[in-house]
Amino acid sequence: MRVRKPAVAGYFYESGREELLQQIEWAVKHELGPKALQMPKLGGEALGGVAPHAGYMYSGPVAAWLYSALAGYGKPDVFVIVGPNHYGIGAPVAIMKSGAWETPLGRVEVDRELAEVITSHFKEVEDDFYAFSKEHSVEVQVPFIQYYFGDVKIVPIVMWRQTLSTSRELGRAIAKALKEYGRKAYVIASSDFNHYEPHDITTRKDEMAISKILKLDEAGLFEISSKFDISICGIGPIGVLIAAAKELGYINVTLLKHATSGDTSGYKDETVGYASILFYR
């Protein structure tokens, strides 16, 4: 069995099991966190949402909001996690179709069945284990999933080809696959928002981008990000989630929490934006 070993344990999050459990608990209880492990449902069913992927000491409290919200909708069979490929390693759109991912909290198995169905609907996605070797955008979601939901499967996908058309095609393919799969699944778009600008500028730019997401306007998101130089590293995965949501009828989108690294670190001269956003119907 192919096992993807942790690449950023001890860097983005604690490398010891007990320390990591304590770190996630800290994120939940943080003044910027949700305070509770389960939030009341906002609607009948949830598709998933957007979550940040920075170091837990910076973005963990914001990420916890999405997982606490999803916990209110119940445990799924699988998480489809779509993240950016920061390093440009491997295929333009890469999926891991079999094997497992390891974290300090144990192993999670890749859902081969769902991965195969997604691939059948989008021929450009390639089974490429190497593409995930250094990438943290999927990895940092996995301990949160393990903490909140225990033993569930995942389908990891990363993309360095983050065009609007690729995002739409992959999103529609995931939607079709979930219809065929027939079991409970959540889709996570792993993304941070604006990068390395003062807190006030990052906040303003993020709010412009988030307004497009709340309207399910993926084209508008790409347009405004280009026009105002909003450096969203996972704009493609967010586009994937929006396209899937529209295809499946998840037309309600709620911003759960928005903050910057300045809010958690206190250093506001050069910040990164984070948001947890829930998609439901």
Swiss-Prot record:
InterPro entries per the UniProt record, alphabetical: MEMO1_fam
Pfam family, one: Memo
Similarity comment text for this entry: Belongs to the MEMO1 family.
PANTHER family: PROTEIN MEMO1 (PTHR11060:SF0)
Protein's recorded name: MEMO1 family protein PAE0818
